[in-house]
């Protein structure tokens, strides 16, 4: 029998007591209908308790561990089943003492063994409840209750065997659950070792980019292996750069082959041939104008033919090119080639111009030396005056020729000279006469003077006025040229060249020959009278459209001016016929050295112009 005060026992669960009492009430025949409701309530309570136990196991898993109680001689270990069984007190009898060491060893094994089996504590608890609650009908369970409502029970041999099996199962399940519950989510977190982090750089110990990892892996390779890998496996940028470089090299080779090909050689050959022909024909006085045109034409045509060839080749290259870089490079090469072609053309024109200028200078020096030998004396000032062009030309052509005479710069090249300037230079060079035929043309000029007298008496007043103004202006210009230079300055007459006959001499608007002769005369008239006679003529204007200078005639002329003209006319009217006769006789007897004396020529030219103006002022008066 079980005595309540002898030994501590395991208290029985209240739920089991209620279920036992309900079973006893059902056995009674005179129970009421309320018992059914009580039974239902008991079932609900059981379910709720099971759910509570499950929640407790999840929250506090260590509370369901089996606690060992010392005292092998008089008690078994108490098994705490988390409220399902408050206490189970098993009093061993004489035959049960042999099983006590086995139970104790199993309890020690439960505390020592640890296995990893997840979430089996609940199943073990359910099985243990089932074993404890569902007692077999063949087993005898004695229930003793004391006054303090403490229930103790005792089981026989068959009940003990079932209890031992349940305890063994519980020990295995609880031991596996302890190891599982020890492992938490924090165990999976890597431990950060600060000692190892201090060895790395301060800015990358927390985060390392994947590129740096790749670079670190590449550093491990040898340089030869790395070069082999880069050369075998090109990046897209490297391939694009290679393609552009290959395209540029191909275009450079094509331009080089084009520059050396026979496509451009005929134009260059023709240019050289025509330029050489032009340089050879520069010595003749009548071919300068045509030569300049030929130079200009051949230079421009050669450049155009070369440029057209370059343009066609550049279009082909632009079609063959595959990238934008090669196209832009093609344009750059085309511009560079054009610059080279222009440079070569300019160099060729420089050579031709230098050759022409040297030829003209040598020709002038030879003629000047011939005249100096004939005269015996020839000063430097006279040579400079002789080498310059006549002052009757325009100012721009004068400055151009003076710079061309003293400097070898190619101002007549097509790039820096307009066709009008070249034509004017050609015209003046063509009509410049040699010095050796002065006497013959003096005699011809006498005939032209007689023709002028006839025209003056036959033409109406308008024509006479134009003739008078033309002669007056020309005489004033000759006086200006004489006053600007010294008295010993050479004055050259303008006359047609040997290749041009007198019938082809150009005439002005009034059918008067444009070429005048300054005839030598007697030095009897003073220079002051000539200057006073030129003063009213200088005040006259001229018309640029017709190329002739005319007097602005008005009804009321200045009396002083007219008086001066009349006085001069009266003073020099007696010398007119004697001058013409003496000049005609001097054409065959006077030597050439006396003909070219500058002082007599200047005075005679001024005298000749003054005699032409003697009676001309009366023609405008009615």
UniProtKB/Swiss-Prot annotation:
It comes from Xenopus tropicalis. This is SLAIN motif-containing protein-like. Belongs to the SLAIN motif-containing family. InterPro entries: Slain. Residues 405-415 have a biased composition (Low complexity). Pfam families: SLAIN. Keywords: Coiled coil. Residues 416-430, 484-502, 525-591, 599-611 have a biased composition (Polar residues). Residues 404-441, 473-622 are annotated as: Disordered. It comes from the Eukaryota. Residues 34-60 form a coiled coil.
